A protein has these predicted regions:
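Extended, compositionally biased flexible segments
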Residues: 1-100
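Interfacial segments of alpha-helical transmembrane regions
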Residues: 101-106
């Protein structure tokens, strides 16, 4: 088969301990999945989960021991950080039951759901989709994927983010409103999951703005952390 132009390269993510990389299919994100974050955004309760997406090429790979540069995006003066656990899907399926979800997980990574909060809020006020606030170039910094078998305690792991050495976000994966397994069950009822899908599982409280020159360092117990410098 020939193409009218050369197709873009497949986006892929490093895997801890392997030379092979993880090819990215889709990026799903869960909104308001920690109680305290839901409250700081003006919501409360265990509402049904809702999802949005980022393009695969929004990935910005942060390699271990290095700080990756992220260009400050256009059209915003209020760029926010959201540190998240990312689930990497290794086996696809639809209508996956929570009890079977672990069979579909390849591994986990640390990710940032970078958000143009001013644009997101403007779209919310107008009752319009807020893709412009979430789905932009470099909006999904992510570290290497650790195979699931190597992090059996991920469901109770600590999660944190520092900006310029100061704590901004600190919580525990156990505080997810919808657990990893429940999220997979709900998500796979709406879309058929495929190998290569990523799920950003939501952010804890403490989201806030970053500026050019800031350095963000995020981590989750058992996973390789990420470091991002805003340019």
């Amino acid at each position: 088969m020939s193409y009218v132009f050369t197709p873009p390269a497949t986006v892929s993510i490093a895997v801890v301990g392997l030379s092979d990389t993880f090819p990215v299919h889709r990026i799903y994100c869960v909104g308001r999945n920690y109680v305290e974050h839901a409250q700081e955004m003006g919501h409360s309760g265990r509402d049904a989960p809702f999802f949005f997406m980022k393009p695969a090429d929004a990935v910005l790979l942060a390699t271990p021991g290095n700080t990756v540069a992220m260009p400050y995006p256009s059209l915003t003066t209020n760029l926010h950080h959201e540190i998240e656990l990312v689930v990497a899907i290794g086996a696809g399926g639809a209508n996956i039951k929570a009890a079977d979800a672990a069979k579909h997980i390849y591994g986990y990574a640390v990710g940032l759901d970078m958000t143009r909060r001013d644009l997101q809020n403007d779209m919310k006020k107008q009752g319009r989709p807020w893709c412009i606030g979430k789905s932009f170039d470099h909006s999904a910094p992510i570290g290497p994927i650790t195979p699931a078998a190597q992090v059996p305690g991920i469901a109770t792991a600590a999660i944190h983010l520092q900006v310029n050495g100061q704590d901004r976000q600190r919580s525990n994966i156990a505080k997810l409103i919808w657990s990893i397994a429940e999220t997979i069950e709900q998500l796979s009822a709406a879309w058929t999951l495929q190998p290569g899908d990523l799920i950003f599982t939501g952010t804890p409280e403490g989201v806030g703005a970053v500026a050019r020159g800031d350095t963000l360092v995020g981590g989750i117990d058992g996973l390789q952390g990420i470091s991002v410098h805003m340019e």
